Amino acid sequence: MIQNVTDDKIQWKCLESKIESQRIHYGRFAIAPLKKGQANTLGITLRRTLLSDLDGICITSVKIDNIKHEYCTLTGVRESIQDILLNLKEIVFKGVCDKTQKGFIFVKGPKKITASDIQIEPCIEILDSNQIIAHLTEPIDFKVELTIEKSMGFRLQNATQISKDSFSIDAIFMPIRNVNYSIHPVEKAGDWKSELLILEIWTNGSITPKEAFHQASEKIMNIFLSLSNSSDNQIQEKSTKNFEEKEEFIFQNIDGFKQDKETKVQESLGWKKISINQLELSARAYNCLKNEKISTLFDLLNYSQEDLLKIKNFGKRSFEQVVNALEKHFDMKLSKDSSKKFYEQLKNLELINNKDIS
């Protein structure tokens, strides 16, 4: 508990900032004084914005000479194609990337290929040039073409190749690795009705936690500024016209509603491609899920919190691991309702049948 806060003006301060590794930067911030309830509202808003609304740069597709599918093997290359794609996925970029960029690797073995071997435009740079991509054990030519993009959030790989000899990969654009917050009571004028918000931010090194904090704050501020810029008179004058425009817009877009639902279904079915390995669970929790035939996030999302606790040998600790991992890696939560809820949501869209989600 923190005592004797007298200033009414909300202030923030960086309590700690350190570089844990080249790809993990940590920052801890304090925001106070806040009225009771404001700290939780602000903490949730900042966390959501940090995890979903900040731009990042990463590789989105890869073209490797003489490779037609990801299960091929290359003579003279120690790693499998899947391993190479995973290594490329982990490379962190920073800089300015207003349009899609191309990167290239042209090397001859034997050689250890690292991120420093990637030829890219000077507007972007690789954070950790020592990241290993592959090992060439024989004197072979190794040629790779990379597509590098800037966006927000993450993008699941396409089910099919983008073009001949080219593969899309799961692109994680978000520069934020994790965000935690905690709320502490503060004494002010003899009572404990004020609160202090502690915010912890881990980034991938492409931006500092302080930069991430500023960017998220600006995005939140811009949202509220857009709401406050219109006066009551302006709102009153436009209300009738806006209603008519919205009514016309709604009826014009009825035909497009089915297409929107199809998009929602495709996004939902994309979770079938993400293995529960990505949750980094303990062996016990992982084996319990596998025994229950839960292999992907899509499978897991069809279980409610209550359903998970009913799984044989699946205790409270394993349950907490799954819940925390879902929130940490994908900012998702399991439903508290029936285990069939996720399936039913897809079925209710009237665009899929049991065959689509089996």
From Swiss-Prot:
Q: What is this protein called?
A: DNA-directed RNA polymerase subunit alpha
MF terms (GO), sorted A to Z: DNA binding; DNA-directed RNA polymerase activity; protein dimerization activity
UniProt xrefs under Gene3D superfamilies: 5' to 3' exonuclease, C-terminal subdomain, DNA-directed RNA polymerase, insert domain, RNA polymerase, RBP11-like subunit
SMART domains from the UniProt entry: RPOLD
**SUPFAM superfamilies the record matches:** C-terminal domain of RNA polymerase alpha subunit, Insert subdomain of RNA polymerase alpha subunit, RBP11-like subunits of RNA polymerase
Q: What is its EC number?
A: 2.7.7.6
InterPro entries on file: DNA-dir_RNA_pol_insert (IPR011262), DNA-dir_RNA_pol_RpoA/D/Rpb3 (IPR011263), DNA-dir_RpoA (IPR011773), RBP11-like (IPR036603), RNAP_asu_C (IPR011260), RNApol_insert_sf (IPR036643)
Q: Which reaction does it catalyse?
A: RNA(n) + a ribonucleoside 5'-triphosphate = RNA(n+1) + diphosphate
Q: What keywords is this UniProt entry annotated with?
A: Chloroplast, DNA-directed RNA polymerase, Nucleotidyltransferase, Plastid, Transcription, Transferase
Q: What does this protein do?
A: DNA-dependent RNA polymerase catalyzes the transcription of DNA into RNA using the four ribonucleoside triphosphates as substrates.
**Oligomer status and interactors:** In plastids the minimal PEP RNA polymerase catalytic core is composed of four subunits: alpha, beta, beta', and beta''. When a (nuclear-encoded) sigma factor is associated with the core the holoenzyme is formed, which can initiate transcription.
Domain writeup: The N-terminal domain is essential for RNAP assembly and basal transcription, whereas the C-terminal domain is involved in interaction with transcriptional regulators and with upstream promoter elements.
Q: Where in the cell is it found?
A: Plastid, Chloroplast
Per the UniProt entry, what are the Gene Ontology biological process annotations, in alphabetical order? DNA-templated transcription
Q: Region Alpha N-terminal domain (alpha-NTD): which residues? A: 1-231
> Where primarily located?
plastid
In terms of CDD domains, this protein maps to: RNAP_alpha_NTD (cd06928)
Source organism, top-level taxon: Eukaryota
Q: Which family does it belong to?
A: Belongs to the RNA polymerase alpha chain family.
Q: Name one GO cellular component term.
A: chloroplast
Region Alpha C-terminal domain (alpha-CTD): what ranges?
266-358
